[in-house]
């Protein structure tokens, strides 16, 4: 089987860091990830308080709705700027697919982590030091189980991105990919909220951990997504992508 376009790595070069398009894209990832984490964490705090006696299920459902909306809106808003990744797992998975160079992906990840950290630190200031929700394993869920769960959730996330955004033969109308991705994030949050919190995003987990100093099992939220995401990209390419129908190449996410 020939090496397919979606499974090619491109190293890139340091000069990319000074290209105007790259600078705009990195700034976009910082800004949109900041907004994503700020709204996401704030909504989780609010959902927990509002649920009150309704219990954990109501809080998870409310948080899932908020996550779905904020991902759909901000991924759409940032799509033409940087691709609207908002997530190191998405960025590194797309690097595996050759849609972004490894050098630029490193800049994206740094910007995403910075945006997440700033969002959580600001939120702690605005809430008077109120407890910041941190992704953690539920009782009875071990680290290996947590990694597996996060890998599966992130696998589905990247599979949807491949099918609705990257594949030129996609059935989804143009521009609806980020919306469908947001809906999937909401569904995964409901499914995995009571297990691992269904992060699917190392940056989303990093900011709260940094702001609170709670690092227990934090590595789970890196290993799981970074295993599941790239696997989905490779699997989609090998199993479902028809290179001849696609004209021999995928349409890369916009980088400028």
UniProtKB/Swiss-Prot annotation:
Chief place where the protein resides: membrane
Membrane topology, record value: Multi-pass membrane protein
Coiled-coil segments: none
Motif NPA 2: positions: 201-203
Domain of life: Eukaryota
Record-annotated membrane-spanning stretches: 25-45, 59-79, 86-108, 146-166, 178-198, 220-240
GO biological process terms held by the UniProt record: water transport
Keywords: Membrane, Repeat, Transmembrane, Transmembrane helix, Transport, Vacuole
UniProt keyword 4Fe-4S present: no
Tissues expressing the protein: Expressed in roots, leaves and anthers.
Subcellular location: Vacuole membrane
Residue interval(s) of motif NPA 1: 87-89
Bridged cysteine pairs (disulfide): none
A molecular-function term among this protein's GO annotations: water channel activity
Pfam family, one: MIP
InterPro entries in the record: Aquaporin-like, Aquaporin_transptr, MIP, MIP_CS
Keyword Protease included in the entry's annotation: no
One of the record's GO cellular component terms: vacuolar membrane
PANTHER family: AQUAPORIN TIP4-2-RELATED, AQUAPORIN-8
Sequence similarity: Belongs to the MIP/aquaporin (TC 1.A.8) family. TIP (TC 1.A.8.10) subfamily.
Known role: Aquaporins facilitate the transport of water and small neutral solutes across cell membranes. May be involved in transport from the vacuolar compartment to the cytoplasm.
Recorded domain comment: Aquaporins contain two tandem repeats each containing three membrane-spanning domains and a pore-forming loop with the signature motif Asn-Pro-Ala (NPA).
Protein name: Probable aquaporin TIP4-2
